[in-house]
């Protein structure tokens, strides 16, 4: 699955 993690405004990391 995919999971999008937000660390701050305009910052995100998508983990496959």
UniProtKB/Swiss-Prot annotation:
Localization terms from the record: Cell membrane
Name recorded for this polypeptide: T cell receptor beta joining 2-3
Record keywords, A-Z: Adaptive immunity, Cell membrane, Immunity, Membrane, Receptor, T cell receptor
Subunit and partners: Alpha-beta TR is a heterodimer composed of an alpha and beta chain; disulfide-linked. The alpha-beta TR is associated with the transmembrane signaling CD3 coreceptor proteins to form the TR-CD3 (TcR or TCR). The assembly of alpha-beta TR heterodimers with CD3 occurs in the endoplasmic reticulum where a single alpha-beta TR heterodimer associates with one CD3D-CD3E heterodimer, one CD3G-CD3E heterodimer and one CD247 homodimer forming a stable octameric structure. CD3D-CD3E and CD3G-CD3E heterodimers preferentially associate with TR alpha and TR beta chains, respectively.
Cell membrane recorded as keyword: yes
Function statement: J region of the variable domain of T cell receptor (TR) beta chain that participates in the antigen recognition. Alpha-beta T cell receptors are antigen specific receptors which are essential to the immune response and are present on the cell surface of T lymphocytes. Recognize peptide-major histocompatibility (MH) (pMH) complexes that are displayed by antigen presenting cells (APC), a prerequisite for efficient T cell adaptive immunity against pathogens.
Highest rank taxon of the organism: Eukaryota
Organism for this UniProt entry: Homo sapiens (Human)
UniProt key word Cell membrane: yes
One CC-aspect GO term: T cell receptor complex
GO biological process, one term: adaptive immune response
């Amino acid at each position: 699955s995919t999971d999008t993690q937000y660390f701050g405004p305009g910052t995100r990391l998508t983990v496959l």
